[in-house]
């Protein structure tokens, strides 16, 4: 099982209190469920994406960013200097559900171009 957390589940950002709190809860639920079900042979992990090039980046905000503002965000705050593409997150999910990840459970895997490594 792979849950969807966010880097904002581990770090705070102004104006998105409920989002940060809910993603933090996803991270803790993932860890608790992993321990509860490890004896059942069920692996439970989560991905924690950073900024992903989807409509969500500009929806649900009082003042949605423009394309130019998103480009500036990527170049000024993300170490790899670009937004993630949805396929890049999907690739990590595919790995986590594969046999190659058979010894991984309870992990929160950041997919954030190095954002949380700073």
Model-assigned labels for residue ranges:
Residues 66-88:
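Catalytic Tyr-x(3-8)-Lys segment
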Residues 10-16, 38-39:
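Active-site "substrate specificity/gating" loop of NAD(P)-dependent dehydrogenases
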Residues 35-39, 102:
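Alpha-helical segment proximal to the catalytic Tyr-Lys
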Residues 22, 30:
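Active-site helix of classical SDR
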Residues 27, 49-59:
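Short, flexible catalytic-loop segment of classical short-chain dehydrogenase/reductase
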Residues 6:
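Residue(s) in the substrate-gating loop at a strand-loop-helix junction
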Residues 82-111, 116:
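C-terminal substrate-recognition "lid" of short-chain dehydrogenase/reductases
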Residues 43-49, 53, 97, 110-112:
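Conserved SDR Rossmann-fold cofactor-binding beta-strand/turn motif
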């Amino acid at each position: 099982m792979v849950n969807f957390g966010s880097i904002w589940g581990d770090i705070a950002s102004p104006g998105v209190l409920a989002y940060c709190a809910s993603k933090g809860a996803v991270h803790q639920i993932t860890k608790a469920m992993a321990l509860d079900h490890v004896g059942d042979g069920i692996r439970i992990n989560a991905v924690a994406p950073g900024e992903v090039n989807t409509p969500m980046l500009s929806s649900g905000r009082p003042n949605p960013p423009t394309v130019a503002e998103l480009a500036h965000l990527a170049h000024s705050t993300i170490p790899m200097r670009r937004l993630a593409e949805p396929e890049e997150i999907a690739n990590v999910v595919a790995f986590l559900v594969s046999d190659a990840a058979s010894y991984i459970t309870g992990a929160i895997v950041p997919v954030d171009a190095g954002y949380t490594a700073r």
